[in-house]
Amino acid sequence: MANLLFLCTGNAARSVMATVMLRSLCPEHHIRGAGTFSISGLPMSQRTRVALASFNLSDPNHRSHQLDDADCEWADLIMIFEKEHRDYIERHHPDSMAIVGSLPRLARELDDSDQSLSLRIAKLDLDKSAFDPWEEITDPAGGDQEIFDLCAKEISALLNQLALRF
């Protein structure tokens, strides 16, 4: 059983979608989300709720949460969506850099061997890798429902690949 954390900016869209989706794919793991610039206690955005509903998923109890030291200590893996999230962890939680990787990179590079998840993460040398433009999942905030739906589809496709490796 792994402790998996998704980190986005406000913990209202991308990390919420990913958390709810991965919980449905991997119920045996502990999965939660947080934000780098979040107002704690807010529900997910309405557009996020609708995007999740298109996958027959929901989390009516979600409340936004600002990333803190306890989250970083808890997590076996922190999955991010853009370079700014990596930069935030590097500034505020540098001891966690070895377990921080973008969702696209992890979906592409995490192997599915029988080794422990922590060993497979360590082999990626995430703290030494640069964040490349192909790794970004654009924040749908401020976009219309179609933008949120496209973001949810992108996240879902990546999680369907990655879930097989946990």
Where do the model's predicted regions map?
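Conserved active-site segments centered on acidic
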Residues: 1-75, 83-84, 96, 164
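A short, active-site helix/loop in glycosyltransferases that binds the activated sugar's phosphate group
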Residues: 82-90
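Phosphate-binding/catalytic loops
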Residues: 90-166
